[in-house]
């Protein structure tokens, strides 16, 4: 396939992280390509056939016959649709990786929990020291960076977002679907299009493949009902026929037709909240489905470290604990964080709009021990209004920015309280990314 690419008229649409990695891959294999980007790039690549930079970079795409879309460029962009209708092939870094990869791939998707589950799954698979494990995708590095290192007996674990999945015509050999709720409605046309993008991870699987689904999620279950693949499952509430689940204070697992095995007590899982117990069950199910033995799983789980910006304990100051959950950019993620604490909470929430509704968040705040809601960003007034509707308007404090929200939280907090940054919103506006927002919170707390 690589040889045939040398005869194509290729353009990279957007030179972000993924397409930059793809450009280096093309350069290494002497494949000519052009770059189209809205930005005036300060450090352009060498050896590019043509540069098309500026606001009109998506014009005249039919000059090419193969386009590699950056994940941030929706497939429903009118210029992309026009090019496709005129016979131009639309691809992506993820798609070409799956086409070229000689090793079996486990793809992991869901609305939240992908990063934690991906890293934990990689940790469990790595207990088999006879096999090399590679991971990347939406977390870590673009997998095209390690494609030339792969051998057929390696294993690959990829975190895949809806942006990366939406136009795939090939599914990974193993697919793991976590909870699917609602996200990125600022990007997708509607909820149905978002769900359809997620479904692509399993759409093209065959009877030789494996699909692992969240038994507690009706949407994931509906994907399984239509799949020809062998079905595995995980659950935070009930036993499964083949996979892993939570029951009686333990994490359990079994293969089809075998007795259930207790992997470890829940107290050994170093992650907060029932949603993270489900993530651990998902990782165990994926590890077993990928052929790993469960004996060393308990030790690997006990030693697992929480990822940054995911209910990350920052510090304790004057009897007050501070947690950074900046990755919680959806309502459901923020609710899961709130429900993971028994202590009184001072919640910092808000940010840029993702067209979310906040009624469920306000209900969760009202039902749990949230003493104050420090609200920031574009969505602060809407969250405050939602709290007013459930009779909790008095706990809302609209703050100018994150530093002022933290200052207010410190003023209101008492010994034994928890100050939790769990925004339920995107970071854009005040910050470039959820990482920058979380890093700012950490710096403010520890200063």
Locate predicted features:
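C-terminal helical cap/extension that packs against the catalytic core
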Residues: 45, 50, 359-417
């Amino acid at each position: 396939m690589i040889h045939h690419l040398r005869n194509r008229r290729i353009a990279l649409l957007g030179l972000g992280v993924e397409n930059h990695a793809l450009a280096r891959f093309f350069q290494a294999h002497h494949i000519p390509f052009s770059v189209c980007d809205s930005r005036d790039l300060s450090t352009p690549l060498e050896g590019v056939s043509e540069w098309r930079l500026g606001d009109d970079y998506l014009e005249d795409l039919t000059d090419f016959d193969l386009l590699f879309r950056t994940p941030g460029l929706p497939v429903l962009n009118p210029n992309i649709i026009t090019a496709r209708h005129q016979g131009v092939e639309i691809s992506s870094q993820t798609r070409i990786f799956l086409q070229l990869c000689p090793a079996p791939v486990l793809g992991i998707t869901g609305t939240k929990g992908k990063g934690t589950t991906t890293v934990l799954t990689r940790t469990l698979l790595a207990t088999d020291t006879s096999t090399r494990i590679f991971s990347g995708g939406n977390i870590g590095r673009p997998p095209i960076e390690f494609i030339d290192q792969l051998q057929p007996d390696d294993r690959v674990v990829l975190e895949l977002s809806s942006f990366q999945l939406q136009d795939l015509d090939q599914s990974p050999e193993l697919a793991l679907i976590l909870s699917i709720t609602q996200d990125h409605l600022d990007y997708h046309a509607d909820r149905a299009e978002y769900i359809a993008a997620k479904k692509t991870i399993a759409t093209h699987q065959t009877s030789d493949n494996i699909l692992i689904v969240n038994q507690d999620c009706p949407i994931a279950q509906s994907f399984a009902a239509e799949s020809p693949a062998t079905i595995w499952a995980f659950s935070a509430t009930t036993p499964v026929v083949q996979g892993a689940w939570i029951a009686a204070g333990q994490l359990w697992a079994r293969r089809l037709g075998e007795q259930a095995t207790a992997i470890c007590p829940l107290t050994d899982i170093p992650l907060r909240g029932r949603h993270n117990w489900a993530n651990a069950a998902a990782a165990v199910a994926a590890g077993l489905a990928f052929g790993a033995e469960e004996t060393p799983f308990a030790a690997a789980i006990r030693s697992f470290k929480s990822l940054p910006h995911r209910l990350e304990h920052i510090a304790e100051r004057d009897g007050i604990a501070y947690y950074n959950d900046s990755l919680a950019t959806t309502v459901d993620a923020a609710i899961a964080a709130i429900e993971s604490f028994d202590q009184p909470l001072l919640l910092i929430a808000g940010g840029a709009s993702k067209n979310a509704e906040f009624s469920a968040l306000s209900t969760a705040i009202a039902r749990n021990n949230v003493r104050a809601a420090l609200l920031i960003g574009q969505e602060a007034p809407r969250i405050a209004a939602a709290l007013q509707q459930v009779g909790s308007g008095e706990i809302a404090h609209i703050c100018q920015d994150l530093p002022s929200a933290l200052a207010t939280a410190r003023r209101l907090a008492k010994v034994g309280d928890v100050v939790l940054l769990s925004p339920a919103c995107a970071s854009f506006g005040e910050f470039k990314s959820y990482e920058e927002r979380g890093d700012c919170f950490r710096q403010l707390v520890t200063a």
